[in-house]
Each structure stands twice: as structure tokens, then as C-alpha cells.
Amino acid sequence: MICIIMGSESDLKIAEKAVNILKEFGVEFEVRVASAHRTPELVEEIVKNSKADVFIAIAGLAAHLPGVVASLTTKPVIAVPVDAKLDGLDALLSSVQMPPGIPVATVGIDRGENAAILALEILALKDENIAKKLIEYREKMKKKVYASDEKVKEMFK
């Protein structure tokens, strides 16, 4: 089970990238909105009551949500910094500069799909079915690149 928490509804497009991957893999998930700054009590309630094995925290600007989530659990937390201002660098730096002992894994700016894949890789450590699906997913990606290569080679003959 994966819990996706976004700092605001404006992060929905990023969350949808993660949700699409999780649906493709048939993994149980929940999606919530809670602000580290405006509703810290809701963040705590969600984290404390969630059955999630992994959390994905999506936030822009000051992006304290991933760190707050990490402070409330010993389960893995994956940050997705959002390009809201400053090309997302403010959110990226907020996510990667965590104090010792409170780690947050961080994927690229706006990369909800990579957060989902990383969460699945964590679950795959104990779930062979997910591990097999990840291998198949990578093979599919590989085939697309080979097909693109063939197409482009033909274009420039």
C-alpha cells in the first residue's frame, strides 16, 4: 500500500502521474491533500493512521511536507519536488537537505512517475509479483527505444 500526500490540489497533475503507474501495477494506494504549513495536524493524522508501506509526498515552494511526513514515520518517504516557482529548485533543495536521521528519498522535479516506480521497487523487495512486473515494465521501455532507433535509422537512410 502506498500513500500519496500532496501539499495542495494544485499538485494533482503530478500525483496523477504516480497514480497511473500504480494502477498499471495493480497496487493499492490512497491519495490525500494535506499542507505541512496550513494543516500539520491533518498530515500527522494521515501518516499515523495510514496502512501504507511507503509514502510519496508531493510539494512545491518551501516543500516541507516530505520532511514532516518523514519525521512522523520510520517507513520510506519519497519526495516529489514541484516546479511551482524558481523552476522547482526551492522545492528540490527543501527535499534533499534533510537533517541526519530523517532521510527522504527525492526524485526529479515533477517526476511523479519515478516516485511511483521507486515506491514499487521498495515493495518489490518483499513481493515477487511486483518484482516481475517491474522487469516487464523495463523490457517494455527497452523495446520502445529499440523501435525508435529503427524508425530514426530508416528516416535518415
Curated annotation (Swiss-Prot):
NCBIfam families: purE (TIGR01162)
Known EC number: 5.4.99.18
Binding site for substrate: 8, 11, 38
InterPro entries: PurE_ClassI, PurE_dom, PurE_prokaryotes
Pathway named in the protein's UniProt entry: Purine metabolism; IMP biosynthesis via de novo pathway; 5-amino-1-(5-phospho-D-ribosyl)imidazole-4-carboxylate from 5-amino-1-(5-phospho-D-ribosyl)imidazole (N5-CAIR route): step 2/2
Coiled coil: none
Enzyme class: isomerase
GO aspect biological process, one term: 'de novo' IMP biosynthetic process
A molecular function (GO) term: 5-(carboxyamino)imidazole ribonucleotide mutase activity
Pfam families named in the record: AIRC
Protein name as it appears in the record: N5-carboxyaminoimidazole ribonucleotide mutase
Domain of life assignment: Archaea
Role noted for this protein: Catalyzes the conversion of N5-carboxyaminoimidazole ribonucleotide (N5-CAIR) to 4-carboxy-5-aminoimidazole ribonucleotide (CAIR).
Similarity-based family: Belongs to the AIR carboxylase family. Class I subfamily.
Keywords tagged on the record: Isomerase, Purine biosynthesis
SMART domains: AIRC
Catalytic reactions on record: 5-carboxyamino-1-(5-phospho-D-ribosyl)imidazole + H(+) = 5-amino-1-(5-phospho-D-ribosyl)imidazole-4-carboxylate
